[in-house]
Swiss-Prot record:
DNA-binding region: 262-321
Protein name as catalogued: Homeobox protein Hox-D10
Name of the gene: HOXD10
Lineage: Eukaryota, Metazoa, Chordata, Craniata, Vertebrata
Domain of life assignment: Eukaryota
Molecular function via GO: DNA-binding transcription factor activity, RNA polymerase II-specific; RNA polymerase II cis-regulatory region sequence-specific DNA binding
């Protein structure tokens, strides 16, 4: 924005534009150029120029009668203007802001991010040279890291000696090894051995273990001999019984209690009982309670046994009727 001193027309144009913007005029007085008002301009605009109520002439400025605006003064804005211009605004007597290497719009953080490093313990704080302050006072100079928000930040009143003490304590604690980790380390060392050494180490151990087994096992006691003899006798008897049952199964027995496969029938009824129940079933498939009690007394069975037998007999009859019906249908069909 600064213009050379050799062009007074441009300098006078800029001064008039500043004056008209500060007074709130929307148009420039000598030309038809539009200038925005102070409310339309941003934070770095000429809002700080609302401070020139007594500027009547172009080259005369009374610095004692200037009133400071309510807006905060930024020292960086003064560097934009021409240093030889008579309209240069004097900087108020305020504590000087630190010269930042980053733009003024960036919010300077009060603390900086601290990272653990081995270099911090080695550095001597007295040997640090005095450099101009580019960051906040709370940030240590030996840590050139950029402050990052969202991470752990050191307390403002935290001295450097405490951090050195903590680092020293960390070194001591790292040298001390807990007892619980000794077993793991020994296992890792054993596993890291080559396979040949492992085999060599295992062979003498195996020989010692076998020797111990032979030494510890004396002559067998008489009780153990008796138990083994009884177990052998039981095994031989069970084998004989299995052979007998197999022979019985092989020889077909025409008994009404055994089925064709050789297994015993589930029905515990005798031949006389089944004949009496069959007669009653042919006469009547469904029994009343009184008739069921009479049959149970005559056949020497319980009421529940008679009831179950009749239920099973009805299911059997139903199955037989279904099979005969299917057989008749299949025989009547002609396959072409």
């Amino acid at each position: 924005m600064s213009c050379p001193n050799s062009s007074p027309a441009t300098n006078s144009f800029l001064v008039d534009s500043l004056i008209s913007a500060c007074r709130g005029d929307s148009f420039y007085s000598t030309s038809s150029m539009y200038m925005p008002s102070s409310t339309d301009m941003g934070t770095y605009g000429m809002q700080t120029c609302g401070l020139l109520p007594t500027m009547t002439k172009r080259g005369e400025v009374n610095h004692q009668n200037m009133s400071i605006s309510v807006h905060p003064y930024l020292s960086q804005v003064d560097g934009w203007a021409d240093p030889s211009r008579p309209c240069r605004i004097e900087q108020p007597v305020t504590p000087q802001m630190p010269t930042c290497s980053f733009p003024a719009s960036v919010k300077e953080e009060s603390t900086c991010c601290m990272y653990n490093s081995d270099k911090r313990a080695k550095l001597n704080p007295t040997a640090i040279p005095a450099y101009p302050r580019l960051v906040s006072e709370n940030c240590s100079i030996e840590n050139p890291e950029i402050p990052i928000p969202g991470y752990f930040r050191l307390c403002q009143a935290y001295p450097l000696e405490k951090s050195l003490d903590y680092n020293y304590a960390g070194e001591i604690s790292s040298n001390v090894m807990p007892q619980s980790n000794l077993g793991l380390i020994s296992k890792l060392q054993v596993s890291s051995q080559p396979p040949m050494e492992r085999k060599i180490n295992e062979k003498p151990n195996a020989q010692e273990s076998t020797k111990g087994i032979y030494v510890e096992s004396p002559e067998p006691k008489p009780r153990l001999l008796e138990v083994s003899a009884t177990a052998e006798g039981a095994a031989t008897s069970s084998e004989l019984s299995d052979n007998e049952t197999k022979e019985e199964i092989k020889t077909p027995i025409s008994n009404w209690l055994t089925a064709k496969s050789g297994r015993k029938k589930r029905c515990p009824y005798t031949k006389y009982q089944t004949l009496e129940l069959e007669k009653e079933f042919l006469f009547n498939m469904y029994l009343t309670r009184e008739r069921r009690l009479e049959i149970s007394k005559s056949v020497n069975l319980t009421d529940r046994q008679v009831k179950i037998w009749f239920q099973n007999r009805r299911m059997k009859l139903k199955k037989m009727n279904r099979e005969t019906r299917i057989r008749e249908l299949t025989t009547n069909l002609t396959f072409s």
